A protein has these predicted regions:
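Single conserved hydrophobic/aromatic residue that forms the stacking wall/gate
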Residues: 1-12, 283-291
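Short alpha-helices
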Residues: 6, 10-38, 256-257, 267-273
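Solvent-exposed alpha-helices and their adjacent loops that cap or buttress functional pockets
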Residues: 9-10, 41-43, 67-71, 77-82, ...
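Structural signal for short hydrophobic segments within the conserved structured cores
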Residues: 16, 48, 249-253
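Accessory alpha-helical/coil subdomains and C-terminal extensions
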Residues: 17-83, 88-90, 99-103
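Short, glycine-/Ser/Thr-/acidic-enriched flexible segments
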Residues: 22-23, 94, 223
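Short acidic-glycine loop/turn motifs at beta-strand connectors
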Residues: 82, 93-94, 244-247
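Short alpha-helical segments enriched in small residues
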Residues: 98-282, 286
Length: 291
C-alpha cells in the first residue's frame, strides 16, 4: 500500500517509513523501496556472498584486515552465523558487468586465503545443501544417530530437495538402552566412559553406519542442559563422531548458551564435521560440486 510507505525528503536526505512485521516490510521494500532507490542511484550495486564454515569470526576478520582497512569499492562485510561466517563483497559500477568485474578479484583472493573452509559462493546455498551436494556428487549414502539433538541434524539434511537419493535413515537414540539395542554401543563402554564420551560417540557412528549400510554416519551425544552437567562433564560438552568409509573421527566440543542454542550449535558442528571428513578421507577420486 503506497499510503503505508512514504518517502519524505529534501535535497539532502530521504527517509522511508516502513512497517515492522517482516511479512509486510519485505514485499513493500522489494516492490516499492528498491525501485525508488534505484531511480536515485547512478549506476548499479552488486554483491556476492562467500560462505565459510568452521572458522571463528575473529579469525576471519584478522585474515581480512588488510582488505577491509581503507576499503572503498568494493566493500567487504562479515556476518556471523551458528558455526558459519558469511562474507559479502559489494561493488558499484556503471552496470552489472562493471560491478561484477570489480568483485571478481576479491572473491578470488578470498578463495586463496580460506580454501576448503569456503562451502559456497552462492547466496542461496545453505550448509546442508553443500553437504548434500558433496554426498550426491560422490554417490555416498548417509545416516544420522542423534542423542542430545533429537533429530535436528536429520531435519537439516531433509531440508534439501532430492536428498532421498543419499539419506538412508536417522535414529534418535536418547537412552543408553537405545544406544545399545540399535547402535551396538557396548555396555562396558557406557559403564566406564558414560553416554557423553568420545568412545560412545565413536561406537554410535560406527554402529549407525553398520546398521544402515551407509558410507557416511554422523553421531552426536552431549549435555544440552540446563541440568545434567558436572564439574567433569559440564553443560555444553558434546562429542560428535563421523564415520566415512570405515574411517572414524571423533571431536570434543564445548558450547555455551541455552539448551536450544547448544543443540543448534551441535547440529551445525555435525554438518561441518561431516563435510570435513568427506573432504579429507582417503579417496582415489573425490568429485567436488560447483560452489
Amino acid at each position: 500500500d503506497p499510503e503505508m510507505s512514504r518517502g519524505l525528503g529534501d535535497v539532502y536526505k530521504r527517509q522511508v517509513l516502513l512497517p515492522g512485521p517482516p511479512a509486510e516490510l519485505i514485499p513493500m521494500f522489494d516492490q516499492q523501496v528498491l525501485p525508488y532507490l534505484d531511480a536515485l542511484t547512478p549506476g548499479v550495486i552488486c554483491s556476492q556472498m562467500v560462505k565459510l564454515c568452521g572458522v571463528p569470526e575473529s579469525q576471519v576478520e584478522d585474515t581480512l584486515k588488510d582488505l577491509i582497512d581503507g576499503q572503498t569499492n568494493p566493500t567487504i562485510a562479515t556476518y556471523a552465523k551458528t558455526g558459519e561466517v558469511h562474507i559479502r563483497v559489494t561493488a558499484s559500477g556503471e552496470n552489472a558487468k562493471a560491478a561484477g568485474k570489480t568483485i571478481k578479484p576479491i572473491v578470488k583472493e578470498l578463495k586463496s586465503r580460506f580454501g576448503g573452509d569456503i562451502y559456497s559462493t552462492r547466496e542461496e546455498t545453505t550448509l546442508e545443501m553443500a553437504v548434500a551436494d558433496l554426498l550426491l556428487a560422490n554417490d555416498l549414502t548417509v545416516t544420522t544417530a542423534e542423542s542430545c539433538t533429537g533429530g535436528m541434524i536429520a531435519a537439516r539434511i531433509i531440508n534439501v530437495p532430492g536428498v532421498s537419493e543419499c539419506y538412508k535413515a536417522g535414529l534418535v537414540t536418547y537412552s543408553n538402552k537405545a544406544k545399545r539395542k540399535f547402535l551396538g554401543v557396548r555396555k562396558s563402554t557406557l559403564d566406564k566412559y558414560g553416554a557423553v564420551s568420545s568412545k560412545t560417540a565413536g561406537e554410535m557412528a560406527k554402529g549407525a553406519a553398520l546398521l544402515l549400510k551407509a558410507d557416511v554416519a554422523v553421531a552426536v551425544t552431549g549435555i544440552a542442559g540446563p541440568d545434567g552437567g558436572t564439574e567433569e562433564k559440564p553443560v555444553g560438552l558434546v562429542y560428535i563422531g563421523c564415520c566415512v568409509k570405515g574411517e572414524l573421527t571423533v571431536k570434543e566440543y564445548h558450547f555455551s548458551g541455552t539448551r536450544s542454542q547448544i543443540r543448534e550449535a551441535t547440529t551445525s558442528a555435525a554438518l561441518i564435521l561431516m563435510r570435513s571428513c568427506i573432504l579429507t578421507v582417503s579417496y582415489t577420486h573425490l568429485t567436488l560440486p560447483t560452489t
